[in-house]
């Protein structure tokens, strides 16, 4: 044992600075090496803050230090100069002790610690450098291989680029890719040199194995080149990212986390740990005894007061109910007066403001934040901030008690704040008991106190440490150490094992991606779909940083582990973040910078304290703006924006405030990173990675404008292709920094139930229709259209009328004010005067009977009030939350609804209840009115369909047909398509609808025969839930020449009618806007067509002139998806002929009549419609005669409202026009059959009741089921057809004529045209860079297997192998190689250099076939020999022959093949004839 003595008597307070515990620590304490960094032992001795988490005890420091690792650092006292014996104090001389000067001793100890740290750091750095060097070598090899492959492509394309403009564009793109690879190679080389310098050059110069570079290596990632030449690999790459198996940087997630045993603890610390555990156990027992005594006393008091409370409870409840009813009635009168004032306000000229701003309807702020539809405004953010600030004062008195110690709460619970109960906030039926017993009663359950109070934080941390020690002792006794093995990543990053193993696999991948961003000193957008646990991924990553104790390079190494972190989020979810942090990683000190926080002193001091202790500060977007100077004064390690799309306006004050943090570590969490336009995406990316997308003007000019313009219906082919290329480049640029997984991709991991989302088009009531039409015809709208008035007020008025006419007109008897004794129907806001409320009434009645629970969202608080009155009148239990609900009250309401299953409805405004709120207690969602911003409605939907939901979720979006709401829905779809084009699929088809100002102020009244404008736009997408139409039935019967019983049509008409849709080109679509709606409303035009019918419906093209095309004919692609619309562009095409319209309308008349007249149960119709219609379409001559018929409906009455109702399941349904159903209905699991039947029952009841349901649309089928853009598909089909024809022409030239008597090569036998063995090709002038196949080397079985397995048996395109190595292993016609070469014109043009050269080498070098060769040969042979007239065939003959042979994917190619193979003309009788061209006869 040694001693240190300090002779300096002038500092007596420092005499005992080294107690025995610390002296032992000097001597024996291990200095742990973790990940290349050695902790400073001196800090543990001189500070009370433990490096292992934010513990505050020195004992915890020692405990943490002993866990660091087995490496020990012994302090060598002999290296520290001691005080000479002659210089020692007299009383110490002769005692034989060593005396040290304190300053010298501390300096010596620190020098030894620093030296040890430096040595350990060097060792770790070398180890990391060696590991990183191996990775660099792999990257270098991969990059070099890619460059060689690209050079081969350039060599193949260069000779043809001068003569072929298409190939020239591809060559330019490949050269750009080569430039990118060269830049990447430079960076890799520089990194290699840096690592070589670190390693000292010893054994580092590893020569690249050139032979290995010739092996088959894949590209390191998808790119623009991959988008064009490597579709198969790109799809696989994106699928791995979407399903959470790989990060965007290409790092795959390990299949199974390696179990690593925990390091054995040192014996020196075991006794100390036991002491801590004993003390903790004693303390726990003492507190338990005290708590038991307090509980007993409290129970006596409660039992005495419970009797009196029970006796008065009934009287109190009845009193509150009557008071609430009076308040509701008073508020209704107030809304009536505001409605009258609003009517005058609508007509104000532009530039003038209302005289009384205080009477501005409150719903406007909630409703029209995105009215412009294209770009957000400062008003939206400012409005939310004002809302937060306004309610903050209401909640300050009520909240402060919650976050104080428990003993102070009892006093505060008795206080009922007067500010919360005003004219704008009404407690629901479930809140009234709480209001009488004390407003704070419910908050104790859900609210989680933050760590603003440091004493509370220390107490909570001690509890957590005690529990950890107890749990660890249990594991040690059971010898179960492997369960907590940490998850280790590159460069020493570790996540605690108990935390990491609780994450889903895709969440683990998200943590890995966040670490990759951290290493690159870059930010990112975690854009997982709402409800996939973005919060948990962030907490796990931050916990890993704190746990790993890694120095951050980008912060000058000033932060060890995790530095101060700030999280900005909506006020509704601030305390939800606190709860999640305390649950998943309690060591963090998490404080809320807001009025609802527990910190009672100055906010500036709280910020300073959190920065000092490296804690987590949670605040709102309004506080970021208000306290910008105080917050940005400090250096923050991480800045995280929850619901980061709040900064989508690049010029807003809150956006500029968020972008002033001095840190590269910026993370955005957003389930909808792009909502309206590309300008918003730029704003988000400029926050996480400033400069990545350049400046905003350049980005808008080079990317936003081309991509947006290419998405409109009237875009030219050049604009469409330009938009595609720009979208590819933009997607490749942002992909590494945007991680987005969808629920549909990770559904199996989450075990999420199914979601059924439908759009119910509701008919206006007579009163609504009258008010709507009167307003459209008014002078106010006239002034808007002339530019004299602002459009904003007019749109607000239209939306109010759609919700409820009383919101605009003030209701009946508004002149004299509503009397007290008025009739129920004449009350303000009565539900029978609104078409959508009639539907809501029926839905709620059915769901209440079924025991479902409902979320009811509305944009407007005024509408929410009317719905509240409606719920109270029908005696439904409910809760309500809107902008006036205090921040402190929101989380308790959410918790109460999730836990109390007796509450039926939760009323919410979309903006308040749509962000970060978890309402999985509900399984039915009604979105009462749409928002211009599609993500707003999506956020509301995701409140129920998220992790934790166990039941199937049904979502109904309510829209009024033919009104402004339908236009809003169209705008939502356009924005969603634009988002998909950038984030998902650059080939996303265009949205075939563009509104102008005049269209917004129109009203259409679609009936059963017309359908809605939406049904016309999205015809063929498989979204329509069809219902028969009596008007259409009569018309088609007349066209077909049949009686009303829908007897068998003439056999000759059936294929001819189909041929009209299939081959004959209508002159235009503008005149068929309505007829297409009716013509495609039969079962075959939806998602129930057979493959043959669907393929044939778009397969052929009968042209009236040589220059015409079939673009607009592609109403439906081969898989039933919408490729182009015949209803949109009314100006670009000539009018339609009457005969064509009739034929289109009657194409499937037989099947439609069959559907009308056959009574089938609804479940059978939904499940088995596909097979039924398939058989009926092909054999309608026999089956339609035997089907039981129902009588025709009666003649239409004078009242058009009632005469146009359609029939469903044989029953007339009021207000029904048609119904759509989800096209993948038949593929759902059998386990969801009960839920589906429940939804079907609801729809059936809606159609049977006298409700305002007009039609039903599947929203998911429109958003997710869209096919690629028609122009891109047609261009691809044309290229494939041209290549196939060239291959056929070359093959024909190789065959001998009939006079030779030589059999033609069949693949097995024959001589004529058979390729000879591969000749020695040395000395030839042509470039022989492609493999040659000897067909005789492949048997038929082998060829069939290769066709099925595709690329499994074929070499990769970028294989790098020599040509001779693949002589006998050439790919089949169905392989990816053949498709890529055919698509990029890398084979055939060089074989057409000259006829002589081609004839000389035709036998030796056969053309590389495609998968359409057999189809082309069959078509040619049929038309040449098997039709009624050799050499030509009618459309009907072609249909009958190939209808059953065509697959869905072959439809477009088949049409192009036919048009290139034959010439088309019509006979005098109108029959279409296809005649072989001379070169193919």
Swiss-Prot record:
Listed name of the protein: DNA excision repair protein ERCC-6
Example of a GO biological process term: positive regulation of DNA-templated transcription, elongation
Gene that encodes it: Ercc6
Region Disordered, annotated ranges: 309-452, 1040-1096, 1114-1238, 1307-1372
Cross-link (Glycyl lysine isopeptide (Lys-Gly) (interchain with G-Cter in SUMO2)): 256
InterPro entries: Helicase_ATP-bd, Helicase_C-like, P-loop_NTPase, SNF2-like_sf, SNF2/RAD54-like_C, SNF2_N, SNF2_RAD54_helicase_repair
Organism of derivation: Mus musculus
Gene3D superfamilies in the cross-refs: P-loop containing nucleotide triphosphate hydrolases, Tandem AAA-ATPase domain
UniProt-annotated location(s): Nucleus; Chromosome
Residue spans of biased composition, Basic residues class: 327-337, 1192-1201
């Amino acid at each position: 044992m040694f001693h240190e003595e300090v002779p300096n008597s002038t500092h007596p307070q420092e005499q005992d600075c080294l107690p025995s515990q610390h002296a032992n620590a000097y001597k024996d304490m291990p200095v742990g090496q973790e990940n290349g960094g050695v902790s400073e032992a001196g800090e543990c001795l001189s500070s009370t803050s433990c490096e292992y988490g934010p513990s505050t005890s020195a004992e915890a420091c020692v405990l943490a230090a002993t866990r660091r690792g087995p490496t020990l650092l012994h302090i060598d006292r002999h290296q520290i100069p001691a005080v000479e014996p002659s210089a020692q104090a007299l009383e110490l001389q002769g005692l034989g002790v060593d005396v040290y000067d304190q300053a010298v001793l501390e300096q010596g100890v620190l020098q030894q610690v620093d030296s040890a740290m430096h040595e350990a750091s060097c060792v770790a750095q070398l180890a990391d450098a060696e590991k990183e060097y191996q990775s660099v070598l792999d990257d270098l090899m991969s990059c070099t291989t890619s460059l060689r492959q690209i050079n081969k492509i350039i060599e193949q394309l260069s000779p043809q680029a001068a003569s072929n403009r298409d190939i020239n564009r591809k060559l330019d793109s490949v050269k750009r890719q080569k430039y990118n690879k060269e830049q990447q190679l430079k960076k890799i080389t520089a990194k290699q040199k840096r690592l070589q310098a670190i390693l000292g050059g010893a054994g580092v110069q590893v020569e690249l194995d050139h032979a290995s570079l010739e092996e088959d290596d894949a590209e390191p990632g998808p790119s623009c080149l991959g988008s064009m030449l490597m579709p198969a690999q790109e799809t696989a790459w994106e699928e791995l990212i979407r399903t959470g198996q790989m990060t965007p940087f290409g790092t795959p997630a390990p299949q199974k986390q390696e179990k690593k045993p925990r390091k054995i603890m040192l014996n020196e610390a075991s006794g100390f740990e036991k002491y801590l555990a004993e003390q903790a156990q004693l303390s726990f027992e003492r507190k338990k005894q005290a708590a038991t005594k307090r509980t007993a006393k409290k129970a006596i008091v409660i039992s005495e007061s419970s009797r009196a409370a029970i006796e008065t409870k009934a009287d109190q409840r009845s009193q509150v109910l009557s008071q609430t009813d009076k308040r509701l009635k008073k508020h209704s009168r107030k809304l009536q007066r505001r409605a009258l004032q609003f009517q005058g306000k609508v007509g104000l000229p532009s530039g003038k403001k209302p005289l009384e701003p205080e009477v501005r309807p409150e719903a406007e702020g909630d409703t029209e934040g995105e009215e412009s539809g294209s770009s957000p405004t400062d008003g939206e953010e400012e409005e939310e901030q004002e809302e937060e600030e306004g309610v903050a004062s209401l909640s300050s008195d009520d909240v402060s008690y919650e976050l104080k110690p428990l003993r102070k709460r009892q006093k505060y619970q008795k206080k009922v704040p007067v500010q919360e109960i005003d004219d704008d906030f009404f407690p629901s039926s479930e809140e009234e008991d709480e209001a009488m017993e004390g407003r704070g009663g419910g908050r104790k359950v859900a609210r989680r106190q933050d760590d603003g109070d440091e004493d509370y934080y220390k107490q909570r941390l001690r509890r957590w440490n005690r529990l950890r020690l107890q749990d660890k002792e249990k594991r040690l006794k059971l010898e179960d150490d492997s369960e907590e093995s940490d998850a280790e990543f590159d460069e020493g990053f570790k996540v605690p094992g108990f935390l990491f193993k609780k994450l889903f696999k895709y969440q683990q991948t998200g943590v890995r991606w966040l670490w990759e961003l951290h290493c690159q000193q870059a930010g990112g957008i975690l854009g997982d779909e709402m409800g996939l646990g973005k919060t948990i991924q962030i907490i796990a990553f931050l916990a890993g940083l704190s746990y790993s104790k890694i120095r951050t390079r980008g912060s000058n190494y000033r932060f060890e582990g995790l530095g101060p972190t700030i999280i900005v989020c909506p006020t509704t979810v601030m305390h939800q973040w606190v709860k999640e942090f305390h649950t998943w990683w309690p060591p963090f000190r998490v404080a809320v910078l807001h009025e609802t926080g527990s910190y009672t002193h100055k906010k500036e001091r709280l910020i300073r304290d959190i920065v000092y202790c490296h804690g987590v500060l949670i605040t709102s977007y309004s506080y970021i703006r208000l306290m910008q100077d105080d917050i940005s004064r400090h250096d923050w390690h991480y800045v995280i924006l929850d619901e980061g799309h709040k900064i989508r306006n690049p010029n807003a004050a809150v956006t500029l405030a968020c972008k002033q943090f001095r840190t590269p570590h910026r993370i955005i969490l957003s389930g909808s990173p792009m909502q309206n336009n590309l300008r918003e995406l730029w704003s988000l990316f400029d926050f996480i990675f400033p400069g990545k997308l350049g400046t905003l003007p350049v980005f808008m000019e080079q990317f936003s404008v081309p991509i947006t313009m290419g998405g409109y219906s009237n875009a030219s082919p050049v604009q469409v292709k330009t938009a595609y290329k720009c979208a590819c480049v933009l997607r490749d640029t942002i992909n590494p920094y945007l991680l987005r997984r969808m629920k549909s991709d990770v559904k199996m991991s989450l075990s999420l139930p199914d979601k059924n989302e439908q759009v119910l088009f509701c008919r206006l009531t007579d009163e609504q229709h009258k008010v709507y039409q009167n307003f459209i015809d008014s002078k106010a709208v006239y002034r808007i259209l002339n530019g004299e008035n602002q459009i904003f007020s007019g749109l607000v008025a239209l939306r109010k009328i759609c919700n409820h006419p009383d919101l605009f007109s003030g209701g009946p008897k508004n002149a004299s004010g509503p009397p007290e004794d008025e009739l129920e129907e004449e009350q303000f806001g009565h539900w029978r005067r609104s078409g959508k409320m009639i539907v809501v009434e029926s839905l709620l009645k059915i769901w209440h009977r079924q025991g479902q629970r409902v979320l009811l969202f509305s944009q407007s608080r005024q509408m929410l009030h009317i719905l509240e009155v409606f719920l109270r009148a029908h005696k439904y239990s409910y809760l309500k939350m809107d902008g006036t609900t205090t921040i402190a009250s929101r989380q308790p309401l959410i918790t109460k609804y999730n836990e109390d299953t007796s509450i039926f409805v939760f009323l919410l405004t979309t903006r308040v209840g749509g962000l970060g709120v978890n309402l999985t207690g509900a399984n039915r969602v009604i979105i009462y009115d749409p928002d211009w911003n599609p993500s707003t409605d999506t956020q509301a939907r995701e409140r129920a369909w998220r992790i934790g939901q166990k039941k199937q979720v049904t979502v109904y979006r309510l829209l009024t047909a033919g009104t402004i709401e339908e236009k809003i829905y169209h705008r939502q779809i356009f924005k969603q398509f634009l988002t998909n084009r950038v984030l998902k699929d650059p080939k996303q088809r265009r949205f075939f609808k563009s509104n102008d100002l005049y269209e917004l102020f129109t009203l259409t009244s679609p009936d059963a025969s017309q359908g809605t404008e939406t049904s016309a736009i999205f015809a063929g997408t498989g979204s329509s839930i069809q219902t028969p139409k009596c008007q259409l039935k009569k018309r088609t019967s007349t066209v077909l020449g049949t009686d009303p019983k829908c007897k068998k049509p003439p056999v000759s008409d059936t294929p001819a009618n189909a041929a009209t849709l299939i081959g004959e080109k209508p002159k235009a679509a503008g005149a068929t806007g309505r007829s297409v709606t009716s013509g495609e409303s039969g079962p075959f035009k939806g998602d129930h067509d057979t493959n043959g019918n669907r393929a044939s419906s778009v397969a052929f093209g009968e042209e009236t002139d040589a220059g015409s095309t079939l673009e607009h004919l592609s109403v439906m692609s081969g898989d039933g998806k919408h490729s182009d619309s015949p209803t949109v562009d009314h100006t670009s095409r000539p009018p339609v002929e009457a005969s064509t319209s009739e034929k289109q309308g009657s194409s499937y008349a037989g099947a439609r009549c069959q559907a009308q007249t056959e009574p089938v149960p609804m479940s059978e119709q939904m499940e088995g419609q596909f097979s039924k219609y398939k058989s009926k379409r092909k054999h309608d001559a026999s089956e339609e005669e035997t089907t039981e018929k129902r009588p025709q409906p009666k003649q239409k009455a004078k009242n058009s409202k009632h005469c146009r109702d359609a029939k469903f399941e044989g029953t007339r349904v009021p207000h029904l026009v048609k119904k759509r159903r989800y096209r993948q209905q038949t593929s759902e699991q059998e386990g969801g059959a009960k839920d589906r039947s429940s939804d079907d029952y609801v729809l059936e009841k809606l159609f049977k009741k006298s409700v305002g349901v007009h039609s039903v649309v599947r929203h998911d089928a429109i958003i997710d089921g869209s096919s690629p853009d028609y122009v891109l598909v047609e261009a691809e089909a044309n290229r494939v057809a041209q290549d196939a024809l060239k291959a056929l022409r070359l093959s024909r030239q190789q065959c001998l004529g009939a006079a030779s008597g030589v059999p033609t090569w069949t693949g097995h036998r024959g001589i004529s045209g058979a390729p000879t063995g591969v000749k020695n090709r040395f000395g030839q002038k042509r470039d022989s860079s492609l493999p040659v196949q000897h067909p005789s080397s492949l048997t038929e079985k082998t060829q069939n297997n290769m066709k099925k397995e595709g690329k499994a048996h074929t070499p990769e395109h970028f294989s790098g192998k020599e040509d001779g190595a693949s002589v006998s292993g050439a790919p089949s016609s169905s392989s990816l190689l053949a498709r890529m070469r055919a698509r990029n014109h890398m084979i055939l043009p060089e074989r057409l250099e000259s006829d002589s050269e081609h004839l000389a080498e035709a036998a030796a070098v056969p053309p590389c076939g495609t998968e359409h060769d057999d189809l082309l040969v069959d078509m040619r042979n049929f038309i040449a020999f098997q039709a009624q007239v050799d050499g030509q065939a009618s459309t009907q003959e072609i249909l009958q022959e190939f209808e059953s042979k065509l697959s869905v994917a072959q439809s477009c190619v088949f049409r192009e093949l036919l048009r290139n193979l034959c010439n088309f003309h019509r006979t005098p009788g109108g029959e279409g004839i296809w005649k072989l061209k001379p070169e193919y006869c």
